[in-house]
């Protein structure tokens, strides 16, 4: 399906932007799940890489469109349902160099998910499992630790730099916040 030349390329610093879902129809279309902040941004970053049988392959996006609640894609060389089914659940990866550089204080959502959230007093609030966009600011969805002293399962913290968010350390995957652990 892929030429040798395509397979030779591999992302230097791979970043997962989404995942391919189930096949759609008989002509090789696939559903796609995007984890970029604005779902359609995933199409701005090309080329895409996927890993099959431990090998990196570059895939070419031929076309994409909205279908009901989903976005569906057509990849070059994937022309029937069987070929599409082989790609179901493949992660869509790009090289970090393809992403725009961030300004100081901006973070990619994907970098924040998985971080431990600790208050300035040292209380562990749990782990970021998701991000939500609200009108005014982004919100961290923090899953509390199993034996949370306050019996809280999940906390929603506004991502307000300086006000709530005191420090983000991606190296240690820690976010320090000024937050009352009772909430």
Swiss-Prot record:
Keywords: Chaperone, Cytoplasm, Ribosome biogenesis, rRNA processing. Residues 104-183 form the PRC barrel domain. It is found in: Cytoplasm. GO terms for cellular component: cytoplasm; ribosome. The keyword Chaperone applies. Binds ribosomal protein uS19. An accessory protein needed during the final step in the assembly of 30S ribosomal subunit, possibly for assembly of the head region. Essential for efficient processing of 16S rRNA. May be needed both before and after RbfA during the maturation of 16S rRNA. It has affinity for free ribosomal 30S subunits but not for 70S ribosomes. This is Ribosome maturation factor RimM.
